[in-house]
C-alpha cells in the first residue's frame, strides 16, 4: 500500500505536466476499479482544465475547471498497485486502442501495443497521455463538487504529519483514551493522515518507542521526541523518491531509494 511519501512522489512528478493542461479525451477500459466510476465520469473530465494537482493524505486531487461550471475535483487513490504514467505526445500510450466517445468503454486494445492493466487514459491538449494502470484494482477514483472535504473519503482525516497542525499536544489528546498499541493509533487516519506501516515502524524505532506500548501510556516527553522523527523520516523518504520496491514507481517509471536507508 503506498504511503504519504510514495503518493507525494507521484504528485511532484505529475504536477508540472498536468497543471494548466486541458483534458481533451477520456478513455475507460472498464466500468469500475474497486468501486464503479462515478456517473458521467468521462464526460465531466473531458474539456476540463487542470488548475491544481495536490495531495491529501494518500489521495491525489486534481482541481478542475470547465466554462460556466463550478470548480470540482478528481480524486484518486492508488490502492495497492495503482500507478500513473505520463507519456509525451510521441509516446507508446497514444497507441492504446482507438478513440472512444466519453462514457464508452474500450475493450479492443491490442495486447501487442498496450501496457498491461491500463484502465484509464487521459489525453491532454499538448498531445501527452496520462495512463492509470492497476493490476489488482484496489484503487479508485471519484469526482467531488465544491470543497475537497465534501467527500467521506476526506471528511474525517486527521492533520497532515508535515503540517503545523501535527504536534505532540495533538497526539497526547488523541491518545488519552486509546488503549491500543501506539503503532495502531498512528495508523488511524483520523488521528494523523497519510501514515502507514512502513514509516510508522521506522519512526517508532528511531524514537526508541516500542510499537506495542499502549498509546494512552505514551507521555508528552516521548511524543515530543516522536513528532520530529516522523517528520524527518517522511521528508527523507520524499527526498529519496519514496520507498518503492516494485509496485510504485514514480510517474517516469523510476524507483524510489528510501528502502536502502531503513534502520528497521
Protein language model regions, located:
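Structured catalytic/nucleic-acid-binding cores of DNA maintenance enzymes
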Residues: 1-264
Amino acid at each position: 500500500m503506498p504511503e504519504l511519501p510514495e503518493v507525494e512522489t507521484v504528485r511532484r512528478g505529475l504536477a508540472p505536466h498536468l497543471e494548466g493542461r486541458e483534458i481533451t479525451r477520456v478513455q475507460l477500459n472498464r466500468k469500475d476499479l474497486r468501486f464503479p466510476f462515478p456517473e458521467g465520469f468521462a464526460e465531466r473530465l473531458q474539456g476540463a482544465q487542470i488548475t491544481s494537482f495536490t495531495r491529501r493524505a494518500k489521495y491525489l486531487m486534481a482541481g478542475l475547471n470547465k466554462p460556466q461550471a463550478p470548480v470540482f475535483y478528481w480524486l484518486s487513490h492508488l490502492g495497492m498497485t495503482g500507478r500513473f504514467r505520463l507519456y509525451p505526445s510521441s509516446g507508446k500510450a497514444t497507441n492504446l486502442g482507438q478513440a472512444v466517445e466519453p462514457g464508452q468503454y474500450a475493450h479492443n486494445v491490442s495486447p501487442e501495443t498496450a501496457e498491461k492493466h491500463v484502465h484509464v487514459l487521459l489525453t491532454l491538449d499538448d498531445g501527452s497521455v496520462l495512463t492509470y494502470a492497476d493490476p489488482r484494482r484496489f484503487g479508485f477514483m471519484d469526482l467531488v463538487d465544491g470543497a475537497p472535504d465534501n467527500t467521506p473519503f476526506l471528511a474525517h482525516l486527521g492533520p497532515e504529519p508535515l503540517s503545523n497542525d501535527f504536534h505532540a499536544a495533538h497526539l497526547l489528546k488523541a491518545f488519552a483514551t486509546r488503549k491500543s498499541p501506539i503503532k495502531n493509533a498512528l495508523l488511524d487516519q483520523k488521528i494523523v493522515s497519510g501514515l502507514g506501516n512502513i514509516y510508522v515502524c521506522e519512526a517508532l524505532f528511531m524514537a526508541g518507542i516500542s510499537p506495542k506500548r499502549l498509546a494512552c501510556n505514551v507521555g508528552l516527553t516521548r511524543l515530543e521526541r516522536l513528532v520530529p522523527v516522523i517528520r524527518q523520516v517522511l521528508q527523507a523518504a520524499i527526498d529519496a523518491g519514496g520507498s518503492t520496491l516494485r509496485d510504485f514507481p514514480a510517474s517516469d517509471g523510476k524507483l524510489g531509494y528510501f528502502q536502502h536507508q531503513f534502520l528497521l
